[in-house]
Amino acid sequence: MLREVIYCGICSYPPEYCEFSGKLKRCKVWLSENHADLYAKLYGTDDNTQEVEAVTNKLAESSIGEAREEKLEKDLLKIQKKQENREQRELAKKLSSKVIIKREARTKRKFIVAISGLEVFDIDMKKLAKTFASRFATGCSVSKNAEKKEEVVIQGDVMDEVETYIHSLLEEKGLKDVKVETIDAKKKKKPAAEGAAK
């Protein structure tokens, strides 16, 4: 048999447990106004009601006072608001940052691709390096760049594939608006010796 449970409008506990909420006075007023029959059942209408009332009032006074209770509620709201603001700032930081994919020539026809700027998005760089190594069948490692930030270095000319994978990875995390910048840095050829040209 299903039974309907009534919850207090002040403390959100069932009325039988209102005494543990620290808001007993207000809970009793709410209960007497909204559910008089339940109030009579719990707190009685006998002669000893006044005694029970006196004891419960003492208990209510000894628990947290109303002013202090309101202060605690305000502090809780402030903390929640700070948390929301922090989350918004982090999201804005993620959206304003950019991922840089840079291709550099090593020797002759050998290239490396360096990906930086992913640490902002809480992506595990070592896992990503392992994924790239198995996906492209190349050597891949995580190293620190000149700015002391982690970057993934992939051996081989796989810039286009990496770019599409990074786009799909960011979309998966719900960050479609993040800029992915590609830089193609080729080594400058050394000029021939002037004496040999003449």
UniProtKB/Swiss-Prot annotation:
Main location: cytoplasm
Record's GO cellular component terms: cytoplasm; ribonucleoprotein complex; ribosome
Keywords recorded for this protein, A-Z: Cytoplasm, Ribonucleoprotein, Ribosomal protein
Residue ranges annotated for the SUI1 domain, each copy included: 99-170
Lineage top rank: taxon: Eukaryota
CDD domains in UniProt: DENR_C (cd11607)
Coiled-coil intervals, chain numbering: none
Transmembrane segments: none
Location in or out of the cell: Cytoplasm
PROSITE patterns named among the record's database cross-references: SUI1
GO biological process: formation of translation preinitiation complex; nuclear-transcribed mRNA catabolic process, nonsense-mediated decay; ribosome disassembly; translation reinitiation
GO terms of molecular function: RNA binding; translation initiation factor activity
Subunit composition and interactions: Interacts with the 40S ribosomal subunit.
Note: Present with 21600 molecules/cell in log phase SD medium.
Domain commentary: The SUI1 domain may be involved in RNA binding.
Family statement: Belongs to the DENR family.
Protein's name according to its UniProt entry: Translation machinery-associated protein 22
